[in-house]
Amino acid sequence: QRDVRVLDPQTMQPVPQDGETMGEIMFRGNITMKGYLKNPAATEEAFRGGWFHSGDLAVQYPDGYIKIKDRSKDIIISGGENISSIEVEDVLYRHPAVIAAAVVAMPDEKWGETPCAFLEVKAGVHVTQEDIIAHCKQHLAGFKVPRHIVFGELPKTSTGKIQKFELRKQVGAAAAIAV
């Protein structure tokens, strides 16, 4: 027996299959683990409501197709609106000067959080924060456009995966200094 659904994590009810309403992908049945070794608190949290919470946010279409939008920890909540960091990163990667991009939440007094983009650009190419913001404004709703752009080498694992947790630390440290 196995069951996969896109559920609202607060109500544990299925989200509408409209291709727009985001929920969390959850599993139950013989396709899940029994729990975390010697960590009952983490097991209890992961299996809230009798379902394994994947941490992946997705939409479901009328035909049942599930499309992953982002990780729950990477969603930016700005003025009550959910912003997918992946959606913003996709737009940034389409800029001809960008070779690597990552977007994380930056604390904001007015909006709660706003997108902050970290970019690596091609050697010898001059691009400004204004250039990047103008590019984003052409492809994204205004509230999704990064308010801050940081240029430089991105921290990566030995396999080349961008370490967003390191970028979140940088943003947190900058926010603490600004206070």
Give, region by region, the residue ranges found by the protein language model.
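Active-site loops of AMP-binding adenylate-forming
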Residues: 8-11, 39-42
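AMP-binding/adenylate-forming catalytic core of the ANL superfamily
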Residues: 4, 23, 29, 34-35, ...
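N-lobe entry segment of adenylate-forming
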Residues: 130, 134, 174-175, 179
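Conserved ATP-binding loop and adjacent catalytic segment of the adenylate-forming AMP-binding
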Residues: 1-3, 11-23, 32-34, 48-49, ...
